[in-house]
Amino acid sequence: MNKILLLLVVMLCSINSMAQSTDAMLFGDVKAKEGGRHLAHAVISIKGTNLKTQCDGTGHYKIGNLPVGKQTVVATLSGYQPQELEVEMVAGKGTEAYFELEKDPLELSQVVVTGTRTSHFVKDVPIRTEVLTSQAITKKNAQNLYEALEGVPGIRVEQQCQFCNFSEVRMQGLGAEHTQVLIDGEPVYSGLAGVYGLQQIGTNDIDRLEVVKGAGSALYGSSAVAGAINIISKEPTYEPSVTGDVQFGNYGFKSYKGSGSMRYNNIGLSVFAQRTEMKAIDETQDGLTRNEVKHKDGISDRVNETMNNLGFSLYFYQPFTKNDKLVIRGKAIDEQRFGGVMTNDQYLNPYTDGTENIKTNRLSGDLAYTLPIGAHSELNFATAYVYHKRQATNDTFLHDYMDSHKDPAHPDEDGAEPDVSIMRPYIAKENTVTPSLTFTSILGKHTLLTGVQGYFTRLRETGLYVISAEDEKTSPYYGVPYTSIGKKHANEIGFFIQDE
């Protein structure tokens, strides 16, 4: 293994040394076609290479050591259509290129990365991809990922339980286990986290959602057979910004949001915080017609929920060498939800029949590093760590205990209840690490991508149960409570190669 790593380092150093200094410089400015004002912070890139720069606050740019000969220069800026210009680069000389960008009302200039793990404009992406921008999410007033995905064509989000409101997302008619949820390209939402994850991921830090439908997203593994949903976090901009949002609604709904972003020279920082509160609702019951359904049945339709969501993103531009980038992120989620039988506020007591009380604590951190190598290659390393804890009480133990302690003379009546002092919640703790390494190289008309992805997880869970199976009725242990302790782990490593 050490020999392989050493060989990789030598190869990268060799490739980097091949990047010759041509001293060919390109400079100019970027303006809006309508009005002629300079556009700050537009991105200038050389097509077919990974060479790029960004305009300063006055809309001017310069970039040096470009390949000699005829080159295609592309100017991009969010909200504007990209523009391409052909220039002739000469060694030791400067060349000028001036851009005038038009507005892009359809946002076809959005750059997406999910489908092929490489950057494409939405209009050029080879895999069916939909983009839901932060502006669209704001217009929907979506408080979480579940609400943001509602109504997106080809996606079905649904709640499966009145007592706890656990949710799942389906694509292409397949089950939720075949849809992969990613955060900045990392598969950090496991089966444990995914049960309530759609409603726990706030929208305050989402720049866009990239939705890839179908098996074209197979680069992310077997969990993405139906498709993948990639949550792209916001990146700091040169214009300092501070936003706040407070909302109040019926049924005890309260929402507080705050965020800030700034970039100074080669360092950028963004922070966000979000708190959502809502009370339990009971407005419907089972039925086949509207008149049958629109009556209360005493069981929560929406659970009582309090969620706190906060995090930061720290960007270092060119920290070690020219055009490289280092990103460090941290996020935390704290949520409590409880629901079930609402008669006499029974759902407020976690240790009663017909109620559920779930508390979630989640801490995550990730690091991503991008290193351009020469003019046509790029190395990307990313890793994420997640600590996820869930503490839950439900009526499984209580129901089984009462069922196994019925009076034989009165089988239709509830059995004896256990001593509350022996009852314990279900507790699960999971630690997950997801490292990945990719190498991209442009060879003529081909873009070659190779990479390796790892997924390592450790899960420990404990719960209180009771022996209550029918075939155990003659056993002396029938009706006896016991504690179950489970330890599980998974180590997955995948290698992929792609030519496009």
PLM regions: where:
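A beta-strand signature from Gram-negative outer-membrane beta-barrel systems
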Residues: 152, 200-243
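Face-selective signature of the C-terminal outer-membrane beta-barrel domain
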Residues: 319-335, 358-500
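Transmembrane beta-barrel wall of Gram-negative outer-membrane proteins
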Residues: 250-277, 289-336, 361-368, 372-374
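Short acidic/polar hinge/loop motifs at secondary-structure boundaries
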Residues: 64-65, 168-170, 186-213
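Hydrophobic, lipid-facing positions within transmembrane beta-strands of outer-membrane proteins
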Residues: 167, 227, 240-242, 254-258, ...
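Short, acidic Ser/Thr/Gly-rich low-complexity loop/linker segments typical of extracellular
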Residues: 49-60
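Short, acidic, small-residue-rich periplasmic hinge/interaction motif at the N-terminus
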Residues: 29-35, 42-47, 76-80, 90, ...
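Extracytoplasmic beta-strand/coil segments of soluble accessory domains associated
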Residues: 129, 146-187, 207-208
